Amino acid sequence: MKVAVLGAGAWGTALAAHLAARHDTLLWARDAALVAELAARRENVRYLDGVALPPALRYEADLTAALSHAQADDALCVIAAPVAGLRALCRAMRDAGRVPAHFVWVCKGFEADTRLLPHQMVAEELPDHASYGVLSGPSFAREVAQGLPVALTVASASAACRGRTLAAFHHGAMRIYTGDDVVGVEVGGAVKNVLAIATGIADGLGLGLNARAALVTRGLAEMSRLGVALGGRAETFTGLTGLGDLILTATGDLSRNRTVGLQLAAGRSLDDILAALGHVAEGVRCARAVLSIARERGVDMPITEAVCAVLFDGVAPRDAVSGLLRRDAKAE
C-alpha cells in the first residue's frame, strides 16, 4: 500500500516509521532543510532524537508530490499536523486538486477561533469528500517509534476509510480498533489534555496518589458529559480514546500537558514553560474552547474551570485546588 504522512513532527515521524515496515511510505514536511536532514541522518533530531528511522522510509518537501503518492483508492494519507494546521492542509489539498481518496488525521483539540472539532473543519473545507476519519488513542510518539505495543482507534462514518486505515496500521506491535463515533473520539482526545494539566498540578503540589485518582475519575465524568452533549456516545469515553488516553496523558512522564501542570505547580510562568517545552501542548491551546463550549451547553466542568483559572487568570495552583475542595457535596 502507498501511504503519505503529512507532518514530520514527533507523532508523524513515529507513525511513518511504523508504516514503512510494511508499506511504501512517504513522509512530508514543508521545511526543506528538515527533509534533507531526515534523509541524510535517518533520524529526526529535532523532534524524536535518538530513534533510528527505517531505511525504507522516504522523505518529501513538495506537498503535491506527497499527495500524488496517496491518490489511489488503495492508498492512504495520514495528516499529522496539529489542530492549528489541519484546515490549511485541507485547503492545500483542495486547491492542488489532490484530495486523497482516503485520509485520517491524528491531531487532538478544538480550533481556537471557531471552537470546531477536526471533523467539522474538514467538512467545511472538503464538503464533497466522505472517506475520512480520526486515528486516536493512548500513545506516546517515542514508544511507537521504538516499536513498543500500542492500541489505537480509527473512527469514521466511512467503512472504506476504516478498512484502509486498519490495513495500513494493524501490524507489528500496533493494534487497531474501529468505530464510527467520530465526535466521541475527538472530544476525548481534546479534553484529556486539559485534564492532564490538572493532574500535573496536583502531582507537582505533592497532593498524593489519592488526589490523582480522584482527578482522573472526576475528569472522566467531565469529559463524558461534554462529549454526550456534543453528540458522542457515552460508552466511547470508557474506551481507548477516552479513559485510556486520559490515564496515559495524566500519569505518563512523556506527557507534555502533564509537564505543563508540574511546572505550573513549581511556580514557573506559562510563557517560560512553553518556551522550554519546544513542542505543542494542546491542552493549553484548547482549554479556553473546552470551557467556553461547556458553559454554552450548560455542562458542569469544575476541573477544567480550575485549569483555565491557573493558565489564564493568574490564580495560584494551590488556590485552584482549594477551590475544588470547597465545592458543595453531591451525589456521584
Curated annotation (Swiss-Prot):
InterPro entries: 6-PGluconate_DH-like_C_sf, 6PGD_dom2, G3P_DH_NAD-dep, G3P_DH_NAD-dep_C, G3P_DH_NAD-dep_N, NAD(P)-bd_dom_sf
Catalyzed reaction equations: sn-glycerol 3-phosphate + NAD(+) = dihydroxyacetone phosphate + NADH + H(+); sn-glycerol 3-phosphate + NADP(+) = dihydroxyacetone phosphate + NADPH + H(+)
Metabolic or biological pathway: Membrane lipid metabolism; glycerophospholipid metabolism
Residues binding sn-glycerol 3-phosphate: 108, 137, 139, 192, 245, 255-257
Pfam family, one: NAD_Gly3P_dh_N
Compartments (UniProt record): Cytoplasm
Annotated catalytic residues: 192
Binding site for NADPH: 11, 30, 108, 141, 256, 280, 282
Cellular component GO terms held in the UniProt record: cytosol
GO molecular function: glycerol-3-phosphate dehydrogenase [NAD(P)+] activity; NAD binding
Enzyme category, top tier: oxidoreductase
GO biological process, one term: glycerol-3-phosphate catabolic process
E.C. numbers: 1.1.1.94
Keyword set, alphabetical order: Cytoplasm, Lipid biosynthesis, Lipid metabolism, NAD, NADP, Nucleotide-binding, Oxidoreductase, Phospholipid biosynthesis, Phospholipid metabolism
Similarity comment text for this entry: Belongs to the NAD-dependent glycerol-3-phosphate dehydrogenase family.
NCBIfam families assigned to the protein according to its UniProt record, in alphabetical order: PRK00094.1-2, PRK00094.1-4
Job description of the protein: Catalyzes the reduction of the glycolytic intermediate dihydroxyacetone phosphate (DHAP) to sn-glycerol 3-phosphate (G3P), the key precursor for phospholipid synthesis.
Protein name: Glycerol-3-phosphate dehydrogenase [NAD(P)+]
Organism: Burkholderia thailandensis (strain ATCC 700388 / DSM 13276 / CCUG 48851 / CIP 106301 / E264)
Gene: gpsA
